[in-house]
């Protein structure tokens, strides 16, 4: 009987068998393999020298080695070479199988690591955005005294007992009249000329998005619902969010100057004071809050309404606030004392108010209602002097032009109507696409351009009333739009919680 070693493929001198694989080996070769690896070379199972079983056979008589110059010698050399190749091939197959298993395991680990990295990256991004809304800026660390011209902090944040309304005293009425006279005189001096610095229509039509900021408000409660620019420095941006916060943002430094917290519901209206470091906000929590920007604190809470506050406008004097509400009243309040001077409702209508806006002169103002009416009021007499019917659906926004005689209105009927206050009639209707929503209307400071925000952002040139610009960058509904100084840029906010800027 002839035995062949599974390692050398030769007849072994001291054959033995492995009980693990049942293969025959040359003892000296298998002992060396076990010393190095401790396993059976065929199936890699653990194997020790003690487990090897010797095989007793008659020793074959080895033939004499052939001469190196004979054909048998060549055949023997080829046979030896073949044996070596086979042994090497066997080893390579074993190594290949091991490598494949290791590679498969590594690929599974890599896939799992990629998933973990993607999840952590998403969490880090959300955390950074949340941090951006909470991180105080250096300018807010040191408290500053509120100037004497600003409202007192006494009773800030506490409910106000309005008691009897103060009323429109002769002094207040005279103050309003004097301011209106000054503004009317200035408007007449300007005439129909527009500022030389104002961006021309052909330049405006080339505006494109140049910046987008999404870290102002909370990522967990997305949506910016209100927008205003500081009249004296349009680089300062004011926003109100669904996260109940009011944010003051600096466009030039791209930094949050203040995050103002205090409302218990979303913030739907915000207004910048033109000359003081004050901002105003209104919310469905039925409060109007007056904030000090340097201190990042609330200095006054005006409780003029019993239901959600839907509109907010600052009088040209900078001393009084107009507000509208779901409680069907409009209110006129003093920002210095926080007291409500007068509250009026149209008893014949019995309908909630949706928005309110002062005329540039401040002696009249407009309100929008849930039943599609635009009402013009005389502030001094507190009387409804004109009504503009024609819309269908709740009024969503109204805007007076700086020229003093144009009024733009929008409702849930996919249209914008232009009214001439001198003739008290509708002279133009901008019919938009079906299901187009309009949430914000505003004229630029010169009355040359009209911007509307809603489903998209659209810019119209007044008098011709033709669209010259259209932006669709917001992934959600646009809730606010505003012009920079001399229309050098345009800002917009949306439910995608982004603040976007457009310019050349």
Curated annotation (Swiss-Prot):
It holds the Pfam family WD40_Prp19. Its EC number is 2.3.2.27. It is found in: Nucleus; Nucleus, Nucleoplasm; Cytoplasm, Cytoskeleton, Spindle; Cytoplasm. Ubiquitous. Weakly expressed in senescent cells of different tissue origins. Highly expressed in tumor cell lines. The keyword 4Fe-4S does not apply. One of its GO terms (cellular component) is U2-type catalytic step 2 spliceosome. It comes from the Eukaryota. GO terms for molecular function: identical protein binding; ubiquitin protein ligase activity; ubiquitin-protein transferase activity; ubiquitin-ubiquitin ligase activity. InterPro entries: G-protein_beta_WD-40_rep, Pre-mRNA_splic_Prp19_cc, Prp19, RING-Ubox_PRP19, Ubox_domain, WD40/YVTN_repeat-like_dom_sf, WD40_repeat_CS, WD40_repeat_dom_sf. Keywords: Acetylation, Cytoplasm, Cytoskeleton, DNA damage, DNA repair, Lipid droplet, mRNA processing, mRNA splicing, Nucleus, Repeat, Spliceosome, Transferase, Ubl conjugation pathway, WD repeat. Residues 2-73 form the U-box domain. It catalyses: S-ubiquitinyl-[E2 ubiquitin-conjugating enzyme]-L-cysteine + [acceptor protein]-L-lysine = [E2 ubiquitin-conjugating enzyme]-L-cysteine + N(6)-ubiquitinyl-[acceptor protein]-L-lysine. Its main location: nucleus. WD repeats lie at residues 219-259, 262-301, 304-345, 348-387, 390-429, 433-472, 473-503. Induction: By gamma irradiation and chemical mutagens but not by UV irradiation. The modification N-acetylserine is found at residue 2. Belongs to the WD repeat PRP19 family. The 7 WD repeats are necessary and sufficient to support interaction with the RPA complex. Ubiquitin-protein ligase which is a core component of several complexes mainly involved pre-mRNA splicing and DNA repair. Required for pre-mRNA splicing as component of the spliceosome. Core component of the PRP19C/Prp19 complex/NTC/Nineteen complex which is part of the spliceosome and participates in its assembly, its remodeling and is required for its activity. During assembly of the spliceosome, mediates 'Lys-63'-linked polyubiquitination of the U4 spliceosomal protein PRPF3. Homotetramer. Component of activated, catalytic and post-catalytic spliceosomes. Component of the Prp19 complex/PRP19C/Nineteen complex/NTC and related complexes described as PRP19-CDC5L splicing complex and PSO4 complex. A homotetramer of PRPF19, CDC5L, PLRG1 and BCAS2 constitute the core of those complexes. The interaction with CDC5L, PLRG1 and BCAS2 is direct within this core complex. At least three less stably associated proteins CTNNBL1, CWC15 and HSPA8 are found in the Prp19 complex. This is Pre-mRNA-processing factor 19.
């Amino acid at each position: 009987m002839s035995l062949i070693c599974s390692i050398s493929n030769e007849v072994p001198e001291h054959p033995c068998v492995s009980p693990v694989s049942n293969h025959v080996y040359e003892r000296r070769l298998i002992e060396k393999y076990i010393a190095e690896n401790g396993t059976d070379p065929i199936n890699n199972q653990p194997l020790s020298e003690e487990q090897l079983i010797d095989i007793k056979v008659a020793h074959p008589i080895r033939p004499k080695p052939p001469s190196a110059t004979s054909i048998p010698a060549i055949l023997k050399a080829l046979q030896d070479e073949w044996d070596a190749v086979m042994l090497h091939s066997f080893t390579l197959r074993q190594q290949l199988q091991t490598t494949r298993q290791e590679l498969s395991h590594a690929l599974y680990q890599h896939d799992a690591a990629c998933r973990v990295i993607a999840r952590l990256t998403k969490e880090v991004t959300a955390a950074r955005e949340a941090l951006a809304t909470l991180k105080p800026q250096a300018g807010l660390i040191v408290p500053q005294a509120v100037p004497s011209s600003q409202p007192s902090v006494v009773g800030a944040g506490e409910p106000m007992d309005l008691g009897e309304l103060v009323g429109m005293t002769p002094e207040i009425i005279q103050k309003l009249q004097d301011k209106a006279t000054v503004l009317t005189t200035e408007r007449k001096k300007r005439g129909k000329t527009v500022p030389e610095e104002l961006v021309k229509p052909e330049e405006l039509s080339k505006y494109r998005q140049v910046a987008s900021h999404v870290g102002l408000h909370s990522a967990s409660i997305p949506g910016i619902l209100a927008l205003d620019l500081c009249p004296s420095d349009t680089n300062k941006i004011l926003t109100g969010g669904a996260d109940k916060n009011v944010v003051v943002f600096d466009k030039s430094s791209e930094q949050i100057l203040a995050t103002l917290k205090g409302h218990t519901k979303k913030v739907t209206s915000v207004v910048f004071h033109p000359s003081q470091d004050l901002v105003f906000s209104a919310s469905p929590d039925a409060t109007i809050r007056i904030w000090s920007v340097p201190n990042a604190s609330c200095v006054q809470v005006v409780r003029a309404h019993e239901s959600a506050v839907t509109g907010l406008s600052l009088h040209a004097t900078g001393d009084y606030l107009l507000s509208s509400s779901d409680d069907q009243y409009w209110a006129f309040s003093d920002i210095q004392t926080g007291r409500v001077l007068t509250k009026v409702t149209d008893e014949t209508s019995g309908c909630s108010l949706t928005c309110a806006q002062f005329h540039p002169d401040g002696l009249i103002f407009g309100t929008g209602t849930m039943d599609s009416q635009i009402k013009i009021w005389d502030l001094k007499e507190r009387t409804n002097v004109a009504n503009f019917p024609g819309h269908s659906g709740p009024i969503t926004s109204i805007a007076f032009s700086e020229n003093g005689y144009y009024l733009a209105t929008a409702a849930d009927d996919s249209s914008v109507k232009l009214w001439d206050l001198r003739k008290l009639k509708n002279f133009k209707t901008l019919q938009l696409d079906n299901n187009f929503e309009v949430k914000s209307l505003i004229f630029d400071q010169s009355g040359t351009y009209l911007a509307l925000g809603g489903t998209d952002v659209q810019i119209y040139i007044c008098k011709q009333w033709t669209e010259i610009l259209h932006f669709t960058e917001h992934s959600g509904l646009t809730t606010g739009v505003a012009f920079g100084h001399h229309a050098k840029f345009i800002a917009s906010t949306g439910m995608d919680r982004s603040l976007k800027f457009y310019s050349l």
